[in-house]
Swiss-Prot record:
Function: Negatively regulates Wnt/beta-catenin signaling during development.
First-listed, main subcellular location of the protein, grouped into a coarse class: nucleus
Cross-link (Glycyl lysine isopeptide (Lys-Gly) (interchain with G-Cter in SUMO2)): 8, 191
PANTHER family: HMG DOMAIN-CONTAINING PROTEIN 4
Key words of the record: DNA-binding, Isopeptide bond, Nucleus, Phosphoprotein, Ubl conjugation, Wnt signaling pathway
Listed name of the protein: HMG domain-containing protein 4
Compositional bias (Basic residues): 316-344
Gene name of this polypeptide: HMGXB4
Residue runs in coiled coils: none
Biased composition range(s): Basic and acidic residues: 394-404
Biased composition (Polar residues): 212-221, 270-282
Region of interest called Disordered, as start-end residue ranges on this chain: 51-410, 473-514
Ranges of compositional bias, category Low complexity: 82-93
PROSITE patterns linked to this entry: HMG_BOX_2
Length: 601
């Protein structure tokens, strides 16, 4: 009887492929439909033929058959887990032990259906029976298929995937996950979302602790067409999800081994406990047997079970970092602006000591002169140092400008000749070019005799002497003006003693504003040193002129230098009592008057 039921079930399943095509076609392209369903039809036909041939030989009793299927289920669990999930955790191994020890019988599907429909005892009693019948027949046929598939499939990749899907779907109705997105958070921060269609979201109902099965939509499916359609959807979706898990495992071995742990539906409580133990945003314990009603999804919507990579987690991190860096930059700019404003305000408004400016809410840059806040004197000190630095920089710039001023070059005899003779050539040849003018000047200079050239050389030396003399006088004037200013400052303070009037014998000379010079030997030595320096400077300048100086000038310099030397020497007579015949006042006035006739000053 069981064999006949399975044969009828398979015939009904083969006849309903057109309805399945319509149900699963929504949201997919025509090429994918044709390929997937043609392959599926071929496999189903081959499996059906092999099951018919093998069942006649091997299955004599239904009891023996059920015992064989129970042992086969255990073997399939081991083989599928070893083939796909070789690196699973210890929790999965403990689940396998529980599965082995739990007694399995032909009533497993019935018990599951009772557990599914128990919350809906009042509303769905008539639908329970139809669901139980359809699920019982489907589980019977699927167990036959699996038993023979073990021999045929060998080591092929596609058949084990379908075996896993059909083996798990035979025990229960389709499982729906109510979470909108199944998120896989990789170590890099990448999120992968399994997006379900909106109609499936509405029809799904799952608790956080354990998976619950659909209440009314699952039990309303009365005919075998619905169950066959659901089984086919489970096979296809399980195939897609497992292929994705393979690719993910290649990229991230460590993470995928811990994540990909689909628990079979035979022990739903164990699977829920395993899912709870992994509290890292993972809902993958039932990925393989997820069944999707793809007839509810439209072409414009996202396809049910489509995997989308979401980079929002990384983008949020980047945005946070960019916001932090922007805030830091804004703070630094704000501080710089405040600092510059405080400098300007302190430089512009110099409040005198003792005055207190009363203002409502004064800004931090304006300090109180009488009672200033404690942190405010610091910027004042900073600005003082800044102003000193500015002054030093200005002085350095001035010195550089002075040094950079081009000194007048020494004019050669040829240059002096060209300067004077150029006028005559331009008058003779108006509109002459610069090149031709220079050529003519060179020719004339070559034709000049040696006597004329010597005259031009003497003229050049005389001009150079004038230039040097002018520079020396300007330097001395600057030095004397600075000394005079220093003396005026000292007299204003009152450090010096009151002035002494000169005697009536020297009424022709005005009295010196400064203190009368002393007649001590140190003062005499200072006067003699000044005289020596001035005479050496004069001699150096005379050597440059080479005989162009008049005799009267040299004689005047010699006479002045003799007077300037004898005056200080006369002051030394005060040191010996035998020679001390001149009063001190006369000697001091002589030293004072020497400064007017000292040469070079």
């Amino acid at each position: 009887m069981a064999y006949d039921d399975s044969v009828k079930k398979e015939d009904c399943f083969d006849g309903d492929h057109t309805f399945e095509d319509i149900g699963l076609a929504a949201g997919r392209s025509q090429r994918e439909k044709k390929r997937s369903y043609k392959d599926f039809l071929r496999e189903e036909e081959e499996i059906a033929a092999q099951v018919r041939n093998s069942s006649k030989k091997k299955l004599k009793d239904s009891e023996l058959y059920f015992l064989g299927t129970d042992t086969h289920k255990k073997k399939r669990k081991h083989s599928s887990d070893d083939y796909y999930y070789g690196d699973i955790s210890s929790l999965e191994s403990s689940q396998k032990k529980k599965k082995k020890s739990s007694p399995q019988s032909t009533d497993t599907a019935m018990d599951l259906l009772k557990a599914i429909t128990s919350p809906l005892a009042a509303g769905s009693k008539p639908s329970k029976k139809t669901g139980e019948k359809s699920s019982g027949s489907s589980s019977h046929s699927e167990s036959k298929k699996e038993h023979h598939r073990k021999k045929v499939s060998g080591s092929s990749g596609e058949l084990p995937l379908e075996d896993g899907g059909s083996h798990k779907s035979k025990k229960m109705k389709p499982l729906y996950v109510n979470t909108e997105t199944l998120t896989l958070r990789e170590p890099d921060g990448l999120k992968m979302k399994l997006i379900l269609s909106p109609k499936e979201k509405g029809s799904s109902s799952v608790d956080e602790e354990s998976f619950q099965y659909p209440s009314q939509q699952a039990t309303v499916k009365k005919s075998s067409k619905k169950s066959a359609r659901d089984e086919q959807g489970a096979l296809l979706l399980g195939h897609e999800l497992q292929s994705f898990l393979k690719t993910a495992r290649k990229k991230h071995k460590s993470s995928s081994d811990a994540h990909s742990s689909p628990g079979p539906e035979g022990c739903g409580s164990d699977a829920s406990q395993f899912a709870e133990s992994h509290s890292a945003n993972l809902d993958l314990s039932g990925l393989e047997p997820i069944l999707v009603e793809s007839d509810s999804s439209s072409g414009g919507e996202l396809e049910a079970g489509e995997l989308v990579i979401d980079d929002s987690y990384r983008e949020i991190k980047k945005k946070k970092k960019s916001k932090k860096s922007k805030k830091k930059k804004d703070k630094e700019k704000h501080k710089e602006k405040r600092h510059s404003k405080s400098k300007r305000s302190l430089g512009l408004s110099a409040v005198p000591v003792g005055e207190v400016t009363v203002t409502s809410g004064p800004p931090p840059s304006i300090p109180y002169a009488g009672a200033a806040a404690p942190p405010l004197p610091l910027p004042g000190l900073h600005t003082d140092g800044h102003s000193e630095k500015k002054k030093k920089k200005e002085e350095k710039d001035k010195e550089r400008e002075r040094g950079e001023k081009p000194k007048k070059k020494n004019m050669s005899a040829y240059q002096v000749f060209c300067k004077e003779y150029r006028v005559t050539i331009v008058a003779d040849h108006p509109g002459i070019d610069f090149g031709e003018l220079s050529k003519k000047l060179a020719e004339v200079w070559k034709q000049l005799p040696e006597k004329d050239k010597l005259i031009w050389k003497q003229k050049a030396q005389y001009l150079q002497h004038k230039q040097n003399k002018a520079e020396a006088t300007t330097v001395k004037r600057k030095a004397s003006s600075s000394e005079g200013s220093m003396k005026v400052k000292a007299s204003s303070v009152g450090v010096l003693s009151p002035q002494k009037k000169s005697p009536p014998t020297t009424m022709l000379l005005p009295a010196s504003p400064a203190k009368a010079p002393e007649t001590e030997p140190i003062d005499v030595a200072a006067h003699l040193q000044l005289l020596g320096e001035s005479l050496s400077l004069i001699g150096h300048r005379l050597q440059e002129t080479e005989g162009m100086v008049a005799v009267s000038g040299s004689l005047s310099v010699l006479l002045d230098s003799i007077i300037c030397a004898l005056g200080p020497l006369a002051c030394l007579t005060t040191q010996l009592p035998e020679l001390n015949g001149c009063p001190k006042q006369v000697l001091s006035n002589t030293l004072d008057n020497i400064a007017y006739i000292m040469p070079g000053l």
